[in-house]
Amino acid sequence: MSWTYLCDAADVAPNSLKLVDANDIRVVVANYGSGFRAIPPICPHMEEPLDESGVIANCVLTCTKHLWAWNLISLELLGETEKPLKTYELKEEDGKLLAFIAEELTYDFEEEDDMDDDFFSKS
């Protein structure tokens, strides 16, 4: 495939996430303050939509559902996080964010998670 327009860089505020549609593939653009990442729209843990549950602070993306976190600069897994965050190659040209999308990035999910680690569930 080729480079695909995602959005203007100015459309994604610092420390925020924006869900975009790139030729029928949903992508989340993450602005971590000093740069951008293009990632699949769901957390690799439990299929939680990152545009709704993701929070960025100090260059770290955290899914608030189960507190999995990744450093958006190094992509290092933080804390109890068990799976890497997949990313699309991204570049900025003339204020526009473009991703190289050869195929949709997806995760394999395990069915046996019983949600006991759901920090926000009601007991």
UniProtKB/Swiss-Prot annotation:
EC number annotated for this UniProt entry: 1.14.13.111
Family the entry assigns: Belongs to the bacterial ring-hydroxylating dioxygenase ferredoxin component family.
Domain Rieske per the UniProt entry, residue ranges: 4-99
Localization per record: Cytoplasm
Activity regulation annotation text: MSAMO is inhibited by metal chelators (such as bathophenanthroline, bathocuprione, neocuprione, alpha-alpha-dipyridil and sodium EDTA) and by sodium azide, sodium arsenate and potassium cyanide.
GO CC annotation: cytoplasm
Inducing stimuli: The msmABCD operon is induced by methanesulfonic acid (MSA).
Enzyme category, top tier: oxidoreductase
Keywords assigned by UniProt, alphabetized: 2Fe-2S, Cytoplasm, Electron transport, Iron, Iron-sulfur, Metal-binding, Monooxygenase, NAD, Oxidoreductase, Transport
Subunit structure as annotated in this protein's UniProt entry: The MSA monooxygenase system consists of 4 proteins: the 2 subunits of the hydroxylase component (MsmA and MsmB), a ferredoxin (MsmC) and a ferredoxin reductase (MsmD). The ferredoxin component is dimeric.
Catalysed conversion reaction: methanesulfonate + NADH + O2 = sulfite + formaldehyde + NAD(+) + H2O
Keyword Electron transport: yes
Cofactor: [2Fe-2S] cluster
Functional summary from the UniProt entry: Methanesulfonate monooxygenase (MSAMO) mediates the primary degradation of methanesulfonic acid (MSA) to produce formaldehyd and inorganic sulfite by initial hydroxylation of the carbon atom prior to spontaneous cleavage of the unstable hydroxymethanesulfonic acid. MSAMO has a restricted substrate range that includes only the short-chain aliphatic sulfonates (methane- to butanesulfonate) and excludes all larger molecules, such as arylsulfonates and aromatic sulfonates. All MSAMO components are required for enzyme activity.
Name of this chain's protein: Methanesulfonate monooxygenase ferredoxin subunit
Annotated binding of [2Fe-2S] cluster, by residue: C43, H45, C63, H66
Gene name as annotated: msmC
Pfam families: Rieske
Domain of life, source organism: Bacteria
Principal location listed in the UniProt entry: cytoplasm
Cofactor note text: Binds 1 [2Fe-2S] cluster per subunit.
Gene Ontology molecular functions: 2 iron, 2 sulfur cluster binding; metal ion binding; methanesulfonate monooxygenase activity
